[in-house]
Amino acid sequence: MKYLLPILILNVFSFAGEVDQYLAWNQLPNDESHYLNKLFNEEIQAALDEINKNHNDCSCEEAAGRILKHFGIGLNTPLEKQLKSSTQLDKYPPNEIHISERYKKSIFRRELPFKNLEQYQDYSLEIYIDEVVNVGGIYIGLDKLTHFTASGFLYYKIYRLALEFVESKEAAMQMAIAMGIYGEKYILGKISSGVFSYADLESNFQGFLFALDLCNSGSTRLKRSGKGWELSGSFDLRDYVNPFWDESYNPSYYYENQNLSLMPKSQAV
């Protein structure tokens, strides 16, 4: 257990963003599965190139962990930053909408008496609210992609450590899930944003399953070749994204306190 605490503490520095799925209602961004899959497969190949260069003798399980870790385990991974600034990705709200208009209908917004406070609120929401994208007809926040890779890695790390002192894979999996729930409830959710996101937990878990699939029976599996580790198939994000990633289908719990940079939650929630 002493090995698991530092991993949980690491979560404090991992995520703070939230998503307002309702902003994207009636907007219907285009399906970006192909674009996202291309980026993911490029990053996975880059991770494999690094593994085969510096860790060629590692186990399949270690390689799977290194692939997820390659995406980053901190706040706003490089891939998420790239997607947030991309003009090629259809997302909502788009960059073209002025910040003063972008979050006027957000569930996190409230009426304030002074214009300078309104401007502060605009920038606060700009920092904390992530855009919504369409993956195979399912609308998700960009933050879920970081949860998939970064928290998926943390779940997988906890799982592998837990296997050293629990009796079964099922018990190790339950320990990883329990630590994830604890982090979402007390650190990432209530303390940082006032939101407990069930959709975050689902994307965390699916990232963990991806890591397991890489060395088991997933459609994208690792295999040994003369060059080292390689994929037997292409990664497809749609194999893991499901409606429970959508916070309008799988609503969050909103604590009755301050959230999103000291802004009280809206009465609309």
Please place each PLM-identified region on the residue numbering.
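Intrinsically disordered, low-complexity, mixed-charge
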Residues: 15-178, 188-201, 205-269
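Sec-dependent N-terminal signal peptides
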Residues: 3-12
